[in-house]
């Protein structure tokens, strides 16, 4: 397991040319690390949380690399719960790499998902919310985005906690009925406890079913176009995608290998396959 006391860093934006690129650092001492390479060192070191500071970023040898905007987040008021600083620079891959290489002299590159792992370990989110972060990033349709966002906001966590509270309360009532059965005390109604147990089981089953719905939202509903050769499977495939993805000719047997594409239908992710004709 990674050492959570280490400073970690990673680009937050995709590789390639863009207007802006962002590099995030997290961990005790990350603000001081960046300050050593920043034109307004004292201003940065004394900066409060949730503050923006503009200035120049310098290499280890003191050579200016780029003008940057720093976003400061003091613990525990950050994504990871630790001190966090984000460097916004111009989105030239060469500039990003030079800044990153300078930083990496004093810290290490974050592993995939490590910022979210630290947020989980520091109590900034629970496991359900941590999973929702990845679901929201990977969502390919509107409904998948909405479901992931609700989970990230803690809707599933609150639902699970309420269910757990009901189970705990029912367990206490059962234990009370068992431990004091031989004493002349008012005990919980057994029929009421049984009905509560049945209702809890029903609720748990409903929750389990939503898991299957969530899987379909994440992975997409799979649709396979099959049929005899030259009946229009590839034409339908292209029409659904609204692009000429498959070759269409009057001659049968044009499609030899299956084609796979993702699309959104009414906000739901769909994985559609175009296949060779059945003979």
Walk through the language-model features, giving the residues of each.
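Short, charged low-complexity intrinsically disordered segments located at boundaries
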Residues: 61-71, 127-134, 160-168, 201-208, ...
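Detector for Asparagine
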Residues: 3, 51, 92-97, 101, ...
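Conserved G1/Walker A P-loop phosphate-binding module
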Residues: 17-25, 37-39, 173-279
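Long, non-coiled-coil amphipathic alpha-helical linker/lever segments
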Residues: 124-203, 207
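A glycine-rich (often HGG/GG-containing) alpha/beta subdomain
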Residues: 1-146, 150, 154
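Residue-identity detector for threonine
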Residues: 13, 61, 80, 102, ...
């Amino acid at each position: 397991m990674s050492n959570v006391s280490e400073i970690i860093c990673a680009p937050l934006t995709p590789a390639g040319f863009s207007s802006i690129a962002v590099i995030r650092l997290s961990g005790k001492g990350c603000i001081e690390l960046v300050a050593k390479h920043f034109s307004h060192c004292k201003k940065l070191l004394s900066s409060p949380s949730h503050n923006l500071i503009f200035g120049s970023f310098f290499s280890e040898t003191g050579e200016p690399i780029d003008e940057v905007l720093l976003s400061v987040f003091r613990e525990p008021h950050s994504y990871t719960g630790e001190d966090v600083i984000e460097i916004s620079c111009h989105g030239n891959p060469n500039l990003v790499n030079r800044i990153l290489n300078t930083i990496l002299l004093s810290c290490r590159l974050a592993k995939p998902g490590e910022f979210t792992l630290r947020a989980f370990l520091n109590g900034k989110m629970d496991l359900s919310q941590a999973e929702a972060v990845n679901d929201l990033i990977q969502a390919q349709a509107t409904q998948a985005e909405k479901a992931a966002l609700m989970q990230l906001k803690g809707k599933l966590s609150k639902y699970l906690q309420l269910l757990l509270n009901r189970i705990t309360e029912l367990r206490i009532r059962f234990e009370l009925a068992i431990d004091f059965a031989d004493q002349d005390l008012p005990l919980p109604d057994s029929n009421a406890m049984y009905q509560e147990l049945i209702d809890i089981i029903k609720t748990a089953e409903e929750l389990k079913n939503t898991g299957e719905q969530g899987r379909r939202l994440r992975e997409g509903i799979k649709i396979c176009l099959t049929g005899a050769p030259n009946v229009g499977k590839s034409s339908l495939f292209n029409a659904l995608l609204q692009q000429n993805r498959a070759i269409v000719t009057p001659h049968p047997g044009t499609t030899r290998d299956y084609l796979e594409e993702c699309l959104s239908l009414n906000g739901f992710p769909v994985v559609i396959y175009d296949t060779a004709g059945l003979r």
